[in-house]
Amino acid sequence: QLCPTQSLELGPIADISRGKTNQDKIKIEKDSCVLCGLCASVCAFDALNLEIDGKNIQDLPNYPKWTHFSEIDEENCIYCGKCSYSCPQDAVFFQRNLPKPTDLIHGNISINEEDCLYCKICEELCPVSAITIKAIPESSTRTDLAVPNNIEVDLNKCVQCGVCKRACPQNAIKQVCDTCMYADELPEPEITGKTFIDNNCVYCGYCKELCPEDTIKVVKPFDGEMLIPEAEECKDCQDCIEVCPCNALEIKDGFLSLNEERCILCGACVNACPLDALQLRRSSMKLENITNASWQKIIGKLLE
């Protein structure tokens, strides 16, 4: 819509999103493109880029600058992972480093093998699979006759829960937890990690909505509103739902429903609707440093 040489063409985005075709979402007519950089400047999601002498125009002083952003306060992040699991664009990554169980709890398990029946009850009940009962052949010639006769406890896995001790029918297991009686006095486990948002972010704010510690800040590129059609206008083709990059649209009780908090006013749904039933009204945008008067006029169409 803004290209002064009409060198951009939008592909069949609904079919592309459904996997029916492998066409590009945007086709650039290179013969008519004059490399003005207008399209790359107005794209709030870095889908189009133009480089001049090896430098992205977004880093050059004379081109418009977007000021919207998304960021995570890592100092207060608890590395729960909700932002990563919920991101519709898989743009949030996190790595969590947990302490070893043996650093948090200490104890010992002893087995009286004279009383042990090797019945495997403790092995099957152990919640962390710390107990292994094996059948070690007594004869190298008849390994098929081996019966369970060996028990091992992996103290690196054991959490000193005592389930094995309570379940043993022979009372053959003794369990002593050195730290359990002081559990309330022990320091909290130190959980470290790293969380970051990559360039696939579309600034929907869903991660911010779910974050239990309010450590995520999101400033969207546009302000305004999206008007969804009345029931009789919508034919339930769901093209708009397919192309929405932030899962802001869904069918509820047979009607198209919009999550306004998640909508980024990108206009993908408007372009996909075969009936032109959706209306986009932008009131402002986070685009600054528009120094060229002709560009100001063209870019202003985004708010019409």
For the regions a language model picked out, list residue spans one by one.
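Flanking helices and flexible, charged tails adjoining ferredoxin-like Fe-S electron-transfer domains
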Residues: Q1-E304
